[in-house]
């Protein structure tokens, strides 16, 4: 009998558009060690908001998603809020931005930049 295995879900799905934009931004910076950090902080009119930053380092407890040469990291505190979420990159008349479609969010504010669970 084999030992039981623990299933740890990948916290975030990253679309092709988001991957392409992250790759382009990393190339602009000229630092192949950069990783996209996706995180949740308190704030906004609904209680939580998403954050994006480039980071060279990973903490021991960061979740890492590696795809097509891009690494996305999620810290342990943000992980439960982002399981099942999808990060996309949108360009439109109002500008361009990374967006998160999060099935865990019960409500979002009118502008879409904050959410509650």
UniProtKB/Swiss-Prot annotation:
GO molecular function annotation: 2 iron, 2 sulfur cluster binding; 4 iron, 4 sulfur cluster binding; iron ion binding
Coiled-coil segments: none
Gene Ontology CC: one annotated term: cytosol
Gene designation per UniProt: erpA
Family per similarity comment: Belongs to the HesB/IscA family.
Subunit and interaction comment: Homodimer.
UniProt key word Metal-binding: yes
Cofactor(s) this protein cannot do without: iron-sulfur cluster
Keyword ATP-binding (UniProt): no
A Pfam short name: Fe-S_biosyn
Keywords of this entry: Iron, Iron-sulfur, Metal-binding
InterPro entries: FeS_biogenesis (IPR000361), FeS_cluster_insertion (IPR016092), FeS_cluster_insertion_CS (IPR017870), FeS_cluster_insertion_RrpA (IPR023063), HesB-like_dom_sf (IPR035903)
Transmembrane segments: none
Protein name as annotated: Iron-sulfur cluster insertion protein ErpA
Highest rank taxon of the organism: Bacteria
GO BP annotations listed: iron-sulfur cluster assembly
Sequence positions that bind iron-sulfur cluster: 45, 109, 111
Cofactor: record remark: Binds 1 iron-sulfur cluster per subunit.
Function: Required for insertion of 4Fe-4S clusters for at least IspG.
């Amino acid at each position: 009998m084999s030992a039981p295995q623990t299933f740890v879900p990948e916290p975030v799905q990253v679309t092709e558009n988001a991957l392409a934009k992250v790759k382009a931004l990393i190339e602009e910076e000229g630092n192949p060690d950069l990783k996209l950090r996706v995180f949740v902080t308190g704030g906004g009119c609904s209680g939580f908001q998403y954050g994006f930053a480039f980071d060279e380092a990973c903490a021991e407890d960061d979740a890492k998603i590696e795809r097509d040469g891009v690494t996305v990291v999620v810290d342990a505190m943000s992980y439960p809020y982002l399981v099942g979420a999808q990060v996309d990159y949108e360009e439109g008349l109002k500008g361009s931005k990374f967006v998160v479609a999060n099935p865990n969010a019960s409500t979002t504010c009118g502008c879409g930049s904050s959410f509650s669970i």
